[in-house]
Amino acid sequence: MYVVLIAVFFLSMALVYCIPVSWIQGNVEKSLAVMKTEGERPMYAFYRHSAIVDNHTDMLMYESLIANRDYYNPIQASVSINQYPRYWHGYQVALRPLTVIFQVQELRYLGMLLFYLLFFWSAWLIAEKTRPVCAMFYVLTIASGYLVAVTTCFQYLTTFYVLFGAVIFLLSGYGTDRPLNLMLYFFVVGMVENFFDFLTYPIITLGIPLILLLWMRVRDERMDLPGNFIFMFKASVSWGLGYALTWVAKWGITVVVLGVRYFWRTMSVIQYRLQGSEEEPLDRIGTIQRNLKAWMNVQDAGIISWSRVVLVILVMALLLTVWKKLKDWQTISAYLPILFTASYPYIWYLVMSNHSQIHYWYTYRAQLVAMFGGLIFIQGILKEDSSETVHEREA
């Protein structure tokens, strides 16, 4: 499967670069003019860092549609992406053909329609395969990521498309006569995410499907803590291997097609991302604080403060515990891997601190995993009404 997908990624990129530049030149120039007028990082409606639209990266994506070296053949152009070869740039597979017909304004509209179609489809499946309240938590979680910005930015959209597709594929096959190979599933999701990703917030494509599976395993298989923890670990490793090995494959292809000098350039960037620099030293705790602040919309000297956020969360948790009562400890412990999965964004921030502290105004969306995990965990450990339990057993 790994070799097949790498071949598909490589060939699909090479094929779209066979499209003549003359077919897309006009729409590329008009689209770039629109985004330059808007500015590199416009803030629509909310005027908060949380709602920045990353036109800077979207303009880079459009500029990359046309190779800046005339002597490159389609394979070289598709690997180089204008001397930016460390990523796959999988968005080109859709963006380059569509730009033959459409400009950026039209593609934003089509992208928004596809986003909501996949979003509501995945939410409907969650309601059908789990419980309606889980679907409500899912909708609330995704909506907290400032969708007005997400649906107008191609860089933001691609990871959500992978997430929605992963959830739809998972739940469409869950409970059927042909069970999924879940470790292969997470491996492939990691590969596909890396094909499209710019280190935007890839962890959501692991965290949200994994949380759903951990919840369903307790409900359907009466899974205990060790069983769920081992499953969580294996699934996470599978996703991580798929993500990392797809990146390694791109670097290897780059060396073969363009030369070894590009490999050393990539290694220097990786070193910078992991260790920082004198101008931008790593501040791992500060990175987490920045991303939390952006996500919770905490403003300096504003109405929302850290103390108020924590107080509201504690009061709500206490009220729910008193009102609904907790399940037995064995059941509660089986749900604990969900809480561990909810911590994945913060592990990501600690590892990828340099990137996450610079681009916190969009990497904060990785914390959607924390929100969804927290809500699903609370739902799982609280006692249910007898009518809800009977209905769930009948379903």
Regions found by a protein language model. Give the residues of each.
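Transmembrane-helix motifs of polytopic, lipid-linked glycan transferases
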Residues: 112-135
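Membrane-lumen/periplasm interface segments of specific transmembrane helices
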Residues: 232-317
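Membrane-interface alpha helices of multi-pass inner-membrane proteins
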Residues: 182-209, 231-245
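Juxtamembrane segments of multi-pass membrane glycosylation machinery
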Residues: 93-111
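Membrane-interface junctions at the ends of membrane-embedded or membrane-associated helices
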Residues: 171-182, 215-230, 324-329, 378-395
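Membrane-interface helix-loop-helix junctions at transmembrane boundaries of multi-pass membrane enzymes
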Residues: 225, 319-343
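Hydrophobic/aromatic-rich transmembrane helices and adjacent perimembrane loops
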Residues: 358-381
